[in-house]
Amino acid sequence: FDSIICATDSELYAEIAKYYGAEVPFLRSSEISEDKSPDIDWVAWILNELIDKGRSYDIFSILRPTSPFRLPSTIQRAWKAFCEEPDADSLRAVEKCKQHPGKMWIIQGKRMFPLLPFTNNYTPWHSSQYASLPEIYSQDASLEIAKSHIALEQNTIAGESIIPFISEGLEGFDI
C-alpha cells in the first residue's frame, strides 16, 4: 500500500491507528458514521477529502478492524486476484452461505412468505433439496478492493464487475 489511512469518527481509535502507523488525516463526521450509514458515504467523503489535499488514489481497499483473523497473505492473495482482472471494478470477500436464503422466510402478521420466491423446475426453493439449489455466497466484509473512480462517479463501492474473493477458514470471521 502507498498509504494506510484510518477512517474513523473516534479520537480514541484515531490514536490507536496512529500508534500502529496509520494516518488519520481527519475524523469522519457523525452524519456518515452512524451504525446504519452506508459505506459509500464515508468512502466517497474520504476520497474527496484526500483529493482536496492533493492526494488521489486509483485504487483503495477497505480492511475492517472487526476481521482480526485476516492475514497479510489474505490481502496479498486478494491483491493478486484483483491485478489479474484489470477490467474489474472491485473485489469483495465472500464466503459460502451456511444457511441457503432459498430456505428463509419473512413473517408478516400471522403468515410467512419465502424470502426468495424462486423455483427449481417448478419446485419452490424452500421445498427443494439443498443439493439442487445454486451455491450462494455472502459478503463477509473482511476485505474490499475497488477503483476510486467507481466510488466517486457511480455512488457504489462495488461497481458492476465484481471479483469474488472466497475467504478461507477464519479469514472472514467478523467479531
Where are these regions (language model features)?
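Conserved core of the sugar-phosphate nucleotidyltransferase
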Residues: 41, 68-160
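A short acidic, often aromatic-flanked loop/helix-cap motif at beta-alpha or helix-coil junctions
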Residues: 31-35, 99-100, 170-173
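Short phosphate-binding loop-to-helix
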Residues: 5, 11-61, 69-80
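Short, high-confidence coil segments that cap the C-terminus of an alpha-helix
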Residues: 1, 55-57, 85-88
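Short active-site oxyanion
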Residues: 1-5, 89, 170-171
